[in-house]
Amino acid sequence: MMVNDIEYIRQAEATRVQVLSEALPYIQQFAGRTVVVKYGGAAMKDSHLKDQVIRDIVFLSCVGLRPILVHGGGPEINSWLDKLGIEAQFKNGLRVTDAPTMDVVEMVLVGRVNKEIVSLINQAGGLAVGLCGKDGNLITARPQGQEGIGFVGEVSNVNIKILETLASNGYIPVVSSVAADDSGQAYNINADTVAGEIAAALGAEKLILLTDTRGILKDYQDPGTLIPKVDIREARELINSGVVSGGMIPKVTCCVRSLAQGVRAAHIIDGRIPHALLLEIFTDVGIGTMILGSQYS
């Protein structure tokens, strides 16, 4: 073995030790705490990234955190609508969800995407249980109210009992964003919204949104303008001033709403970065934008 090889091995080992020692205080701090992760975007479509997200979720569970995974599934819904000859329509960024589309949304999110994620977590050594808003009356929906969008819903109520029962016994709840109203009518709800409302109802330590952007950027065209940390007041100002715009507005709004209801910190991170969850939670620097509640110390 060459001297250079030995030095390389030493440096690699030193890096591993540094990473592990840096993670320890965070593992101790967050043990027993609930972390709600919204899973979507490229990290759902790329099989390699998907595998890493799954492993990260299992890691969180193994070191004593209580992860709850909320997922979307837009691309797969579009694929199945296409196979069934149903045209996908959007209005003001929302999927127009008529009765046939709602059937497909529920079939894909609850029957396919959810069960695939559950299976992958279980194969990776976790204990996952798949749910939708209908299970255990977890989420009661109400119409979103906008005209011409069909069965698009909002969260009216969250019943956290089933989540607390599962998480406290070492299970990882995996939640799809389909729920019913009081009459039993199914609704399609934005997965960011569901994650935020679940985090708020549980008083979670963290809400983490996996996205296809680095976080909140001062200039959305320049990844180098990442804002690593803001408080809830500054986040509202960024929306009002137009720095936060387009598709980032509902994500930041969702974070602000959850923080206002008691979540301690919300994170918007780039799910395209390998092991983004672990880097954000267990390292000093983090990789995305952390939005702090006013009570966070």
Curated annotation (Swiss-Prot):
Sites annotated Transition state stabilizer: 38, 251
- A GO BP term, please? L-arginine biosynthetic process
Which compartments is it annotated to reside in?
A: Cytoplasm
Supply the Gene3D superfamilies for this chain: Acetylglutamate kinase-like (3.40.1160.10)
Biological pathway: Amino-acid biosynthesis; L-arginine biosynthesis; N(2)-acetyl-L-ornithine from L-glutamate: step 2/4
Per the record, what is one GO cellular component?
cytoplasm
Task: Name the UniProt key words of this record, in alphabetical order.
Answer: Amino-acid biosynthesis, Arginine biosynthesis, ATP-binding, Cytoplasm, Kinase, Nucleotide-binding, Transferase
| GO MF term set | acetylglutamate kinase activity; ATP binding
EC number assigned by the record: 2.7.2.8
Protein residues bound to substrate:
73-74, 95, 188
Name the enzyme group at the top EC level: transferase
**Family label:** Belongs to the acetylglutamate kinase family. ArgB subfamily.
Protein role: Catalyzes the ATP-dependent phosphorylation of N-acetyl-L-glutamate.
Q: What protein name does the entry list? A: Acetylglutamate kinase
Q: Which gene encodes it?
A: argB
